[in-house]
């Protein structure tokens, strides 16, 4: 919602500064997104008159102008605007002036051999709009040499305020002025309802068939108008909020909508055949709307139509065929009340948005129909002339308003604020509420958001100021334990920290994905009944689709190394499961003079990361089983799963299958992993503190072994067996070499394993070392391995 300071002062008598107004609006619940003064940076632009315009000798599209800028001698300016001509009064920028619309500081220049000492400017070049087909053409009487900002009244700050969906009454400047006045920023001026003289001529012919979609339809016919430009003050305000002035009739409806929050529509009466009727659309009816698009209608949509067809989608947008133009002489002004739900559903079905729709679907003031029509008719008569017929009022808008039994003590009990009853009454009455002696509060017709006591308290609190609500801790009842994090919360916290420590970036992706992607990653189990779009139709069965999309977006923007993780929920048929998802894409190591060409991530990077995350939550990583069959998402030969026992899968990892990467239009390799946090067992609490680490005073001993092992036996099984051969002496066992080739059997592989032995109280003797080695060989033999000769 945008408005200017001068516009606000039409309704609010105030001397408050721009900053005070902005701060107060935000304090009472209307967040000010920006305040912009169009005059900033335009102080140096002056009004100038073109004395002569001659063709440039070296360019057909350029003219050499002699420009009077109010100085003793005219200045020479080279100009390419098609409308530049002798006698035109426009806006001039001298050398040294910064032109914001084109981001250029002017200087004296030679253009095709002719010196130019400045520039005649267009609306776009001034940064005041998008019009750029020609230079500004001001009224002939505009004073040459005067500041354009001063003459045009541009020193008028523009506020941009975010109005919450429940406050339709503040979708007009007057509603905001009412709130500001209540907050002590000024005095609300009374709204004058003008008198409209009428003739005895036949009134507008209107009717209502769809009383649910259009409970009330008011209309007034005005004859003999001349639809010229709107007054400069109105055009200036509309331009300031981003509207291009079109004609007086169109500008009047837009102005009243933003001024009073009352949408209207004006029809060219000459294009109407028969009665204007509010009815349901018929099957296969179409409308060519004012936005230039065609829409197919159906009987669920309320329309305004004549004998020839639809002339308006009720509360949303009119038809091109009944629109007003410069040749319009007779008009019908529509001021109606349309059902908010019907307008909202029609707009969603047609995919059609408008400023009128926003206001109607939030609910306009049903008690302001006649007043809105009178104000519009008076403006038409004042700006366009003509004679008005008697207004026609059909139907009745909803008139029931809540009457709420209230007690001033509710503010203390609900908001912990101490506000005197007299002050509460003052606030409510200034906001438009009526209060009798027994504190029965009658809600104003324009406040659809107020229906219970808590709503009244909320109004009082926001006007008094949330800053005045004391910060008070809630009382903790006897026997109520202090809040502690659950096991699941602690687990998520630990793995999140571990992932960040591993050098990964946390991502937050949508929980909704397309049905196509869901089927790729396990199935579309939870479908939304009313999805935002087809791409957000299903609750994700895996975190990988969102992470893959994020990785692709980053790669498309030039990122060569991507490490992403997310902690979130997967939605499966039986339940939702907390999960940690990981994605590695691109280069693990960039090309380097020392290491040569770049190296991409592989499945081992994912295994290392997963192991680190599991270790952070106390899982015995060295005891986990590494199995294949990670699922169809992964490359069958470059993936695996870590299990605590054969049935409890803690994590899956590996290279994403090329077919899935093709679905996401990505090039591999891309590495992924998921850790199933709810599968992690609870850590047993012994009740004792962990003993501090005490490093041995003795040197460790390293022994290397080379074993021949059947190819179908996982290397991890052998390593785990060796590590358990003598738990008192063996600290670690790890693979340092893998070999297959002609010198060994084709069904075997050679593994080089380094074993770290740590003596406790004294160094190992040769006999002890030999005994440990024998245990290692025996443990390996249980897995089918033998020492390589």
Curated annotation (Swiss-Prot):
It is found in: Cytoplasm. Residues 39-149 form the tRNA-binding domain. Its EC number is 6.1.1.20. The keyword Protein biosynthesis applies. Residues 399-471 form the B5 domain. GO terms for molecular function: ATP binding; magnesium ion binding; phenylalanine-tRNA ligase activity; tRNA binding. Its cofactor is Mg(2+). Binds 2 magnesium ions per tetramer. It catalyses: tRNA(Phe) + L-phenylalanine + ATP = L-phenylalanyl-tRNA(Phe) + AMP + diphosphate + H(+). Residues 696-788 form the FDX-ACB domain. PROSITE patterns: B5, FDX_ACB, TRBD. Pfam families: B3_4, B5, FDX-ACB, tRNA_bind, tRNA_synthFbeta. GO terms for biological process: phenylalanyl-tRNA aminoacylation. One of its GO terms (cellular component) is phenylalanine-tRNA ligase complex. The keyword Nucleotide-binding applies. Keywords: Aminoacyl-tRNA synthetase, ATP-binding, Cytoplasm, Ligase, Magnesium, Metal-binding, Nucleotide-binding, Protein biosynthesis, RNA-binding, tRNA-binding. InterPro entries: aa-tRNA-synth_II/BPL/LPL, B3/B4_tRNA-bd, DNA-bd_dom_put_sf, Fdx_antiC-bd, Fdx_antiC-bd_sf, NA-bd_OB-fold, Phe-tRNA-ligase_IIc_bsu, Phe-tRNA-ligase_IIc_bsu_bact. Transmembrane segments: none annotated. Mg(2+) binds at residues 449, 455, 459. Tetramer of two alpha and two beta subunits. Belongs to the phenylalanyl-tRNA synthetase beta subunit family. Type 1 subfamily. PANTHER family: PHENYLALANINE--TRNA LIGASE BETA SUBUNIT (PTHR10947:SF0), PHENYLALANYL-TRNA SYNTHETASE BETA CHAIN AND LEUCINE-RICH REPEAT-CONTAINING PROTEIN 47 (PTHR10947). NCBIfam families: pheT_bact, YtpR. HAMAP family: Phe_tRNA_synth_beta1. This is Phenylalanine--tRNA ligase beta subunit. The gene is pheT.
